[in-house]
Amino acid sequence: RVLVLGRTPELCACPKHATAQRALEGLTRAIGKEFKKGMTSQVVYVAPGAEDQIESTVRFFLSAKSAYVSAQVVRVSPSDTKPAIDWSKPLAGKTALVTGASRGIGEAIADVLARDGAHVVCLDIPAQEADLQRVAARIGGSVLGLDITSAEAPQKIVDHFKGKGLDIIVHNAGVTRDKTLANMTPQQWGLVM
């Protein structure tokens, strides 16, 4: 990981300093492009007064969570709010809804959100109820068996979270067909979309 911290170019009083800071973007993009797979490069512009507010950004870019994020420019500005964060459970107290949570990518997303402290509501079609129950039980989540393509699904989701709140939605549900577009029937295409 290459993480370059610089000053916000527009806030530099001297044109030479501003130019040098602006060049960091090109440098990190070039590094990001030339490095081999598995390596990343970012620049974080830190405005004066925000030096004590970069921890979450630095932690993210130095973690495995940023493995596919490279050659990005992030700006950190001062803020009056400094929330206390439990870095072992950064999503503690949050509620997440993951659609398509009974297996595959949805299950993995539910695992990560739960690992990070969120209560995960696992949603999938009723036909996947057994797998959905298994995932929810393993991660300490809850189940919402529902076909999100049904006309009543939006209202059922609203009703489920009414008075409870919802902080995170990961809409992962989908249907894949191992066919080329030319070989798909209109019905198969409709399911995918």
Label each residue range with its predicted role.
Residues 1-90:
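Glycine-rich nucleotide cofactor-binding loops and adjacent beta-alpha elements
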Residues 3-6, 42-45, 99, 166-174:
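Rossmann-fold scaffold of SDR-type NAD(P)-dependent oxidoreductases
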Residues 46, 144-146, 179:
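Cofactor-binding loops of NAD(P)H-dependent oxidoreductases
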Residues 88-121:
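Canonical Rossmann dinucleotide-binding motif of NAD(H)/NADP(H)-dependent dehydrogenases/reductases
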Residues 118-134:
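Conserved glycine-rich Rossmann-like NAD(P)H-binding loop of the short-chain dehydrogenase/reductase
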Residues 144-156, 186:
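The beta1-alpha1 cofactor-binding region of Rossmann-like NAD(H)/NADP(H)-dependent oxidoreductases
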Residues 180-181, 188-189:
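Substrate-binding pocket helix/loop in short-chain dehydrogenase/reductase
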